[in-house]
A protein has these predicted regions:
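Zinc-dependent deaminase catalytic domain
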Residues: 1-149
Length: 149
């Protein structure tokens, strides 16, 4: 699947391991196979945008701890850029630890609620084996490069 390959490539290009951060989460939105937005979490710095997402979507954890998750930052940036979100768009979420290994990145309960509340259902995420799961069907994507969605 081209969108997964594009996300992996972009994530490793942005990956900058430090001792302060044990892993990085990345999220990418696609319109067809075109990447329209790419984001990364920031577990160190609070952000008013994360707080605003918590307010707008009634997510108390984001209000209490206003740190962007990659998914919430993706939604915020998509709304800033397009003022709307299409249910036809796909989202790929992945995590890379400081050693460069792809790990599980299934969206947390709050991020899942947020993604679904804006109509995004085509969500793909990495597992601890470095494979990707189709979040809608809960099936592993066998060969991420050859499958088209």
């Amino acid at each position: 699947m081209k969108i997964i390959t594009k996300t992996i490539r972009r994530a490793y290009n942005n990956w900058n391991p430090t001792k302060l951060i044990r892993c990085y989460h990345y999220a990418a939105a696609f319109d067809g196979s075109k990447m329209i937005c790419f984001t990364q979490n920031n577990p160190i710095k609070t952000h008013t945008g994360a707080y605003r997402i918590g307010e707008n979507y009634n997510i108390s954890k984001y209000k209490e701890f206003p740190y962007y998750h990659s998914e919430s930052r993706l939604i915020s940036e998509l709304l800033d850029m397009y003022n709307t979100i299409s249910s036809d768009w796909s989202v790929v979420v992945m995590r890379i630890n400081r050693l460069g290994k792809i790990l599980g990145s299934k969206p947390c309960e709050n991020c899942d609620k947020l993604l679904r509340s804006v109509g995004l259902e085509k969500i793909f995420y990495s597992n601890d084996c470095g494979d990707f799961i189709d979040g809608l069907n809960h099936r592993m994507i066998v060969d991420a490069v050859d499958i088209s969605y």
